[in-house]
Regions:
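Extracytoplasmic gate region of multi-pass secondary transporters
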Residues: 37-38, 231-286, 343-347, 351, ...
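Helix-breaking motifs and short loop linkers at transmembrane-helix boundaries and internal kinks
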Residues: 49, 82, 103-109, 137, ...
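Extracellular/periplasmic helix-loop-helix junction of adjacent transmembrane segments
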Residues: 38-69
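Conserved MFS/SLC helix-loop-helix module at the cytosolic interface between two early adjacent transmembrane helices
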Residues: 69-108
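Multi-pass alpha-helical transporter architecture, strongest
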Residues: 189-193, 317-319, 323-324, 407-438
């Protein structure tokens, strides 16, 4: 299999790194606005008198349904129009809707505002992944995508810290306003400084030559769906990422209420600890993509991308059970830190292989399709499942019902690991068929 040559000379390495830094900053803002709700769930529950099921709906399904479904048509637009403009407009929308969450006086108003956040954030990652794939060649792409994905732990870290402090000092309403406004400023930076790279400019010479001859528009959505579904490795990868996210989002939304209820932590302390834990998770988020690039390069075997995702997912499980079943806080906090490191290792490899499995004009849609599976199964159902399970277990376990609901959620990681290993079986064959198609098409 041929590798990409050195990256293009259209943009300097310094500018490409600058572009990655700006996209990373946008993703940090994305996850601040997305994750802030978790730390604010308890004060919202107390003021608006909501059940755990309703909180799970706010933290998951209401956001994810619109985030995931609109991500696909928005990604299709990004494959046809300016990706930087799609990203900036989306950022303005989700930032404004985050600020409006603070004006909600009842469950319905807050639900609608969270839906608005989901609508805006649907336009974040698909164009960003596509841009990164054109700025960086294939042998550096997983590392670049992992750096972008560092927006998750760093955004969550800031969201938890600001949320814990803001809930105690400002109240949950003003906290939403505080975190919503910076995204509008970042959107302005994207519009004025981020350039739209030529599609395919960081591919191998053969692929670039074919791309230069091929000026046809991007394929229809159904063609992209069919193309990806025919690749067994992507089917397994998509299900694995979705199940992994089911646990990740289910736990992520409910970790703060768990620490408050089962360990009687004050909200400012919870915010500080979860901020530290989220920041530590950056090690795994970067490390997963970096290890994938290095091991696949050393062994000339790109199955390592999915093997890394599968191994890290499997190893997480005992640490998750330790975090939720042990009573000593000095056991719980280190266990959650290990989970945070391992939990991000699937991101870079998963998105890098998704980009590698499709042709140039399918990249934003391919990213959106993986995000659809990840977010419908993960973000949509994970927090909602934990909320429902907690309410159902409450008559038997009372304040500790959330702890056992989280343990039930963790079991999905065992299933996710199986799909990663199954996906690795056909990965080389699927990658080869895509590369042949790109080099021969004209």
């Amino acid at each position: 299999m041929s590798k990409a040559t050195t990256a293009n000379t259209i943009y300097s390495p310094g500018y490409r790194n600058y572009a990655l830094a700006i996209l990373f900053l946008g993703y940090v803002v994305n996850f601040i606005d997305r994750s802030i709700l978790s730390i604010l769930l308890e004060p919202i529950k107390q003021e608006l008198l909501l059940s755990d099921t309703e909180l799970g709906l706010l933290g998951g399904l209401a956001f994810a349904m619109f985030y995931a479904t609109l991500g696909i048509p928005i990604a299709s637009l990004a494959d046809r129009w300016s990706r930087t403009k799609v990203l900036a407009i989306s950022m303005i929308i989700w930032s404004a809707m985050t600020a409006l969450c603070g004006a909600a006086n009842n469950f319905l108003m807050l639900l609608l505002a969270r839906i608005g956040v989901g609508v805006g954030e649907a336009g974040a990652s698909p164009p960003s992944h596509s841009l990164i794939s054109d700025y960086f060649p294939v042998e550096k792409r997983a590392t670049a995508l992992s750096i972008y994905a560092l927006g998750i732990p760093f955004g969550s870290m800031i969201g938890n810290f600001v949320g814990g402090w803001g809930a105690a000092e400002l109240g949950w309403r003003m906290t939403f306003l505080l975190v919503g406004l910076p995204g509008i400023f970042v959107a302005g930076i994207i519009l004025t400084t981020l350039r739209e790279p030529p599609r395919g400019m960081s591919e191998s010479a053969a692929v670039k030559a074919a791309a230069a001859k091929n000026v046809e528009p991007a394929p229809a959505l159904k063609e992209v769906f069919k193309f990806l579904w025919q690749r067994k490795s992507f089917r397994h990868l998509g299900f694995a990422a979705g199940l992994h996210a089911f646990v990740g989002y289910g736990a992520g939304v409910w970790n703060a209420p768990f620490l408050i209820r089962s360990h009687e932590m004050p909200i400012t302390e919870v915010g500080s600890w979860l901020a530290i834990i989220s920041g530590i998770g950056a090690i795994g988020t970067f490390g997963g993509g970096y290890l994938g690039d290095k091991l696949s390069d050393w062994t000339d075997d790109r199955r390592w991308y999915l093997w890394i995702a599968g191994i890290s997912t499997l190893v997480m499980v005992p640490f998750q059970f330790t975090a939720y079943l042990y009573d000593g806080i000095w056991t719980v906090i280190p266990a959650l830190a290990v989970v945070s490191i391992l939990g991000g290792m699937y991101l870079g490899p998963s998105f890098a292989m998704t980009q590698a499995l499709v042709t140039l004009r399918m990249r934003a849609v391919a990213s959106a399709l993986l995000l659809f599976m990840l977010n419908i199964i993960g973000m949509g159902l994970g927090p909602y499942f934990v909320g429902i399970a907690s309410d159902l277990l409450n008559p038997s376990f009372e304040i500790h019902s959330l702890r056992y609901a989280l343990c039930l959620c963790v079991l999905a990681n065992l299933w996710a690991a199986v799909h990663y290993f199954l996906g690795a079986i056909t990965l080389r064959e699927d990658l080869d068929s895509t590369e042949v198609l790109m080099t021969q098409h004209s």
